[in-house]
Amino acid sequence: GTGKSKVLVDNMAMLYDKGKINGAIIVAPKGVYRNWYSQEIPNHLASHIQPKMVLWTALTSKTKDKEYQSLFETGHDLHILIINVEALSTKKGLDFAAKFMRCHKTMLAIDESTTIKNPSAKRTKSILSLGKEATYRRILTGSPVTKSPLDLYTQCGFLNSYLLGYDSFYAFRNRYANMIDRNFGGRRVQLIGSYKRLDELADKLKGFSYRVLKDDCLDLPDKVYIRREVDLTDEQSKAYSTMKSAALALLKGKMATAPHVLTQMMRLHQITCGHLRNDDGTITEIKNNRLKELVNLLDEVEGKVIIWANYVHDIEHIVKTISDEFGSDSIVQYYGAIPAEQRQQNIEKFQDPNSKARFFIGNPQTGGYGITL
């Protein structure tokens, strides 16, 4: 990474030493929030500060409740609550965070702040409301603009609405986007046609943000992209052709809505991956050459390897194939079906130079951002 976490921890320590805060809430996605508890804060917090740090979990017990209550004990300790952003969509998580803030001078920090980019989302509104009670607010992200410059509105608004100069998202949108009208099924809809005044927006950001690129702080070799072409098997080709014809027939003469088109595209993609999920939830296996080519590739490279796959079915097959070829202790897994605590252990195992774990296998939905490997 670029050191975002250390900068935040250092800033938290400075504010604590100056008596500005005595509490902090770190909010991060479920897939990465445990990193703050096990790595980021223990590794970077100044040694003279001995915090009372509690990790939020969905499960409750007498022991866990006692941990939570320790955050409200009086004294001079820095109290830190680490909570996943999904928990702030629940009444229980939101109420506890609000109680914590009422009892502390708090710094509220959002890691991967694109999780609050949607101004109409219930979670975004809850976090913006919560942020108003914080003494200090911070955001961190590796990609502040994921789809549109308009993603910046609520992220910056969380810090302070005056920073961009707009209390209304629609006024902000009209300033920086050209809208066009479209009719869908008799409904008039406004869509973004293009963007404008982006230099002005960039200048505003410079006044209150700090941006660093990996090239500025890491000595990494350039990425090398190599395309490996894998031929479809006869079985795949027939299935693909049949599915393509069926999809075209289904959509012919109809208004092609995005969900319909995406469903057909996903089915075609599944066929190229070597399987097809049927309407009843069962999966049909389709003979393919991908795993054989993957093993050939792994035989050619040395050192650690990260393998991403979109579908759990593919991950399971990749895990079995690599286990058979290189041994079960050569892999760690990171996707939704793996318990959160095990995921964190798998990261540490993969990072350990003395570990036999050579292959990190996961899906980008769970591990595609926010973790440092």
Task: Enumerate the language-model features and the residues they cover.
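Conserved helix-turn-beta segment of the N-terminal RecA-like "Helicase ATP-binding" lobe
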Residues: 32-62, 159-163, 325
